[in-house]
């Protein structure tokens, strides 16, 4: 008789190895069936399409969790340096298809659903976008998570689990209307609540100075409960974690402040604490100094740092008891990347923990903090820079304000020592800005408290060093770096454009998916007639598919043989959707002037959301819809010109429109777009770019060759010269008849006959206070668009140029970006090694 098992041996039966899923069609069908009945408690008679989506999501998720647990076990064993990416936004989009792609489950799931009489694409369309971001900054964070997992980095994304993400945009009567994005209404199968890791976050209160140092007391406490989402790497069995915090009121919230009878009100008031994670602020590139937003910024930072320190102390020991007490090794085990200034309070918060709680002396704590933190800047627009009023910080975070003052004092002492007698430099570099309202400049705090500061495209990083951070660069040039943004080729090629990915793989194999530089091999096919034909065919299929989508969803008819001219991004004056509008009206006027002339047919599509309080951006949307109303109903125009506003632009819509684009509009005023990433997505998906020499466009043109790019307009130096001379819109208005005609049409109510003065604010801005100099680039833009049309008439030459663009887009993989962050900022080495699958021995 065998001896009884010891407790430890019994426990060993609880292992992920015994649960490893078999990834064949029969097993997937069985698991789908099990989840429909046992997880969702439905049978086929009452199951809705959403139930089928959830059953499939749970089936796919089963293949993630073994790898997820294994990955975290591996990190505990190896105790690598961990990377913490702190961001107020993660614009993830949908998860189902991305998970299937990265786990190599797509074909099997396709077949399984087909055998069950279900349509995979229909199920995928049911999933809500996780819209926890405004635009580029949040989407970048999502691409970075994908690349960090694919490169085997022990990385964690930390943010807020907003109950309501970016608003849904509805167009009504030509105007943008906002609707709440209740994305969690039906539940989220991809997240796992972790209530056992709930942490307290403190607000308000006051500081007491004791013999043991400063104490922050009488605070209000809000609890931060984490929800974890798995982030799979590409076919390497690595699954990292995105941890998002949700605000909860403590059980005794407000009860101690109430007299007898106040109980009900106290329970109702719990909402006030929980509002912290209620909604994403919908401002892109604009700072609005609201207390609730400051609470959100501190909330994510305070919870995250407690979590980081807990993991640092207990790491490699498989337990939650503190074991590491010495913080000397902290910067060797922890890297914190601040995605813009939104999580900048991590710097004073880490100082508070080290000095007040861990009793470290200031200089040592400051050394640890600086070596741990790094800061990414995303904008040079002055209205976007965070400058928090001192009175707000004093009330909400009194200890942090004291710490910021101390940081500032010591920092300015260093500046004074380096530049004796330069008083104005001290004023410019101070973290504290004097004025009617005293403010803290959060970018200055980030630079002082980080060992690395990076811009997100070469030209942007140069502008930082020469202009807004010039003084800081002169003090500490070694801190400043460039890390040109990138996009994940998994979502932005394999997932959204499988036809193109297949045509590429037939020629050069599949390795390009995790090594995008391999696309250069396509340069040898630029004269290959079969390849040219295949690339053109895929584009035409994508255009037909998107045209069918527009017809189905919006009842809009478009000509699939027209040039698809697309500008999709947040609506902002600096992105110059207005310049696009002026071109569209100019084209319309030319067609009307010579109705019998041949014009290359175009469908111009503009999409993007305007911040709810941004009047001019909302007027721009109204203008696009008004132009569409006139152009699309003019029989003289026919299908030679169509203007479409793409409603509710979001990640899942980008995945449909970008593969269908012929022309990508990247037309910001030179020196205003830090990088852009939409530009890269279009390039990778076989669109040609019309753009200014701004952001990453500069490097894209360099990679592809300027002759394969439609470049127009002022360079940064020209803009600077024009600023010195003084920009005068009237000069262009007087000199260019076609421009004058367009502006007269806008002024006279040609596009708004029922309300002739509807666009007076736009005209007034363009004529008298246009910071972004639309008229200065108008003429060159129109000429450049003529070159676009001329080339489009020659499909073979157009497609050859497309191939050259695709072949040179490898640099713009987020894998390259993240490998550079890893080596040059975080001090870790990326790895393409596979972890063992859950059913393999470690």
From Swiss-Prot:
Q: Which residues bind AMP?
A: 43, 76, 310-319
Q: Which Gene3D superfamilies match?
A: Glycogen Phosphorylase B
**Gene Ontology biological process terms in this record:** glycogen catabolic process; glycogen metabolic process
Activity regulation behaviour? Allosterically regulated through the non-covalent binding of metabolites, being activated by AMP and inhibited by ATP, ADP, and glucose-6-phosphate. The activity is also controlled by post-translational modifications including phosphorylation.
Give site residues, Involved in the association of subunits.
Answer: 109, 143
Reported modifications of this chain: Phosphorylation of Ser-15 converts phosphorylase B (unphosphorylated) to phosphorylase A.
Cofactors needed by this protein, per the record, are: pyridoxal 5'-phosphate
The PTM N6-(pyridoxal phosphate)lysine maps to 681
Lipid biosynthesis as a keyword of this entry, yes or no, is no
Task: Identify one Gene Ontology CC term for this UniProt entry.
Answer: cytoplasm
Q: Which domain of life is it from?
A: Eukaryota
Annotated keywords: Acetylation, Allosteric enzyme, Carbohydrate metabolism, Disease variant, Glycogen metabolism, Glycogen storage disease, Glycosyltransferase, Nucleotide-binding, Phosphoprotein, Pyridoxal phosphate, Transferase
Q: Which Pfam families does this UniProt record tie to the protein?
A: Phosphorylase (PF00343)
Which PROSITE patterns does the record cross-reference, listed alphabetically?
Answer: PHOSPHORYLASE
Q: Which residues carry this modification: Phosphotyrosine?
A: 204, 227, 473
**Record site feature (May be involved in allosteric control), residues:** 156
Which terms in the Gene Ontology molecular function aspect does this entry carry? glycogen phosphorylase activity; nucleotide binding; pyridoxal phosphate binding
EC number(s) reported in the record: 2.4.1.1
Q: Which reaction does it catalyse?
A: [(1->4)-alpha-D-glucosyl](n) + phosphate = [(1->4)-alpha-D-glucosyl](n-1) + alpha-D-glucose 1-phosphate
| The keyword Glycosyltransferase appears for this protein | yes
Q: Which residues carry this modification: N-acetylserine?
A: 2
Q: Which family does it belong to?
A: Belongs to the glycogen phosphorylase family.
On subunit structure and binding partners, the annotation says: Homodimer. Homotetramer; to form the enzymatically active phosphorylase A.
The illness linked here is:
Glycogen storage disease 5: A metabolic disorder resulting in myopathy characterized by exercise intolerance, cramps, muscle weakness and recurrent myoglobinuria.
Main function = Allosteric enzyme that catalyzes the rate-limiting step in glycogen catabolism, the phosphorolytic cleavage of glycogen to produce glucose-1-phosphate, and plays a central role in maintaining cellular and organismal glucose homeostasis.
Question: Can you name this protein?
Answer: Glycogen phosphorylase, muscle form
Q: Which organism is it from?
A: Homo sapiens
Provide the organism lineage as a comma list: Eukaryota, Metazoa, Chordata, Craniata, Vertebrata
């Amino acid at each position: 008789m065998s001896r009884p098992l010891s407790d430890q041996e019994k426990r060993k039966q609880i292992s992920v190895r015994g649960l490893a899923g078999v990834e064949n069609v029969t097993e997937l069908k069985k698991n789908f069936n099990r989840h429909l009945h046992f997880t969702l408690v439905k049978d086929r008679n009452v199951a809705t399409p959403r139930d089928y989506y959830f059953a499939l999501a749970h089936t796919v998720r089963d293949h993630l969790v073994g790898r997820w647990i294994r990955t975290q076990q591996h990190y505990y064993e190896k105790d690598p340096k961990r990377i913490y990416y702190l961001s107020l936004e993660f614009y993830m989009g949908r998860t189902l298809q991305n998970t299937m792609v990265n786990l190599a489950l797509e074909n099997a799931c396709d077949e399984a659903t087909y055998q069950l009489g279900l349509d995979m694409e229909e199920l995928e369309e049911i999933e809500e976008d996780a819209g926890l971001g405004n635009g580029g900054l949040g989407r970048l964070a999502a691409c970075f998570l994908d690349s960090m997992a694919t490169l085997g980095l022990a990385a964690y994304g930390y943010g807020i689990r907003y109950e309501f993400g970016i608003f849904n945009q509805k167009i009504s009567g030509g105007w943008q209307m906002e609707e709440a994005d209740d994305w969690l209404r039906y539940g989220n199968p991809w997240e796992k609540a972790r209530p056992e890791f709930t942490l307290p976050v403190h607000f308000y209160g006051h500081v007491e100075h004791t013999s043991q140092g400063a104490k922050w007391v009488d605070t209000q406490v809000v609890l931060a409960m984490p929800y974890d989402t798995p982030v799979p790497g590409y076919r390497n069995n690595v699954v990292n974690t995105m941890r998002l915090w949700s605000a909860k009121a403590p059980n005794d919230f407000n009860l101690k402040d109430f007299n007898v009878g106040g109980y009900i009100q106290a329970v109702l008031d719990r909402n006030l604490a929980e509002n912290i994670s209620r909604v994403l602020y919908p401002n892109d590139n604009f700072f609005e100094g609201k207390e609730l937003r400051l609470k959100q910024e501190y909330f994510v930072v305070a919870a995250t740092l407690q979590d980081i320190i807990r993991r640092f102390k207990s790491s490699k020991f498989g337990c939650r008891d503190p074991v590491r007490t010495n913080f000397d090794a902290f910067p060797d085990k922890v890297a914190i990347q601040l995605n813009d200034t939104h999580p900048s309070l991590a710097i004073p918060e880490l100082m508070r923990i080290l000095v007040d709680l861990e009793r470290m002396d200031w200089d040592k704590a400051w050394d640890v903090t600086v070596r741990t933190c790094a800061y990414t800047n995303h904008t040079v627009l002055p209205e976007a820079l965070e400058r928090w009023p001192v009175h707000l910080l004093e009330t909400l975070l009194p200890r942090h304000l004291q710490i910021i003052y101390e940081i500032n004092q010591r920092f300015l002492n260093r500046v004074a020592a380096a530049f004796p007698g330069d008083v104005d430099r001290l004023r410019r570099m101070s973290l504290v800005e004097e004025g009617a309202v005293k403010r803290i400049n959060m970018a200055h705090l980030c630079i002082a408290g980080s060992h690395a500061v990076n811009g997100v495209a070469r030209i942007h990083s140069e502008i930082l060093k020469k202009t807004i951070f010039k003084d800081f660069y002169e003090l500490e040039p070694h801190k400043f770096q460039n890390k040109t943004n990138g996009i994940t080729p998994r979502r932005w090629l394999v997932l959204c454009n499988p036809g193109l990915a297949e045509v590429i793989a037939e020629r050069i194999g599949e390795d390009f998916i995790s090594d995008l530089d391999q696309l250069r091999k396509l340069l040898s096919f630029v004269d290959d007639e079969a390849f040219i034909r295949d690339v053109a065919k895929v584009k035409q299929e994508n255009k037909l598919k998107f045209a069918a989508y527009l017809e189905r969803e919006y009842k809009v008819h478009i000509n699939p043989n027209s040039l698809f001219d697309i500008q999709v991004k947040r609506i902002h004056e600096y992105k110059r959707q207005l310049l696009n509008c002026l071109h569209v009206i100019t084209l319309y006027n030319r067609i009307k002037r010579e109705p019998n002339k041949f014009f290359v047919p175009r469908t111009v599509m503009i999409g993007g959301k305007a911040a709810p309080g941004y009047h001019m951006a909302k007027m721009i949307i109204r203008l696009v819809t008004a132009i569409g109303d006139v152009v699309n109903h003019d029989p003289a125009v026919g299908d030679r010109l169509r203007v479409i506003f793409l409603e509710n632009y979001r990640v899942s819509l980008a995945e449909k429109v970008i593969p269908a684009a012929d022309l990508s509009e990247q037309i910001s005023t030179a020196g205003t777009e830090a990088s852009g990433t939409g530009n890269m997505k279009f390039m990778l998906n076989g669109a040609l770019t019309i753009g200014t020499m701004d952001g990453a466009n500069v490097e894209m043109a360099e990679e592809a060759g300027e002759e394969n790019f439609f470049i127009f307009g002022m360079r940064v130096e020209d803009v600077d010269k024009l600023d010195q001379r003084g920009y005068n819109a009237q000069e262009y208005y007087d000199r260019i008849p076609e421009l004058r005609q367009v502006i007269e049409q806008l002024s006279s109510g040609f596009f708004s006959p029922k309300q002739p003065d509807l666009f007076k604010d736009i005209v007034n801005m363009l004529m008298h206070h246009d910071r972004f100099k639309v008229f200065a680039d108008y003429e060159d833009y129109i000429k450049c668009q003529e070159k676009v049309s001329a080339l489009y008439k020659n499909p073979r030459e157009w497609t050859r140029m497309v191939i050259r663009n695709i072949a040179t887009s490898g640099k713009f993989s987020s894998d390259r970006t993240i490998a550079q962050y890893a080596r040059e900022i975080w001090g870790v080495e990326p790895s393409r090694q596979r972890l063992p699958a859950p059913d393999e021995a470690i």
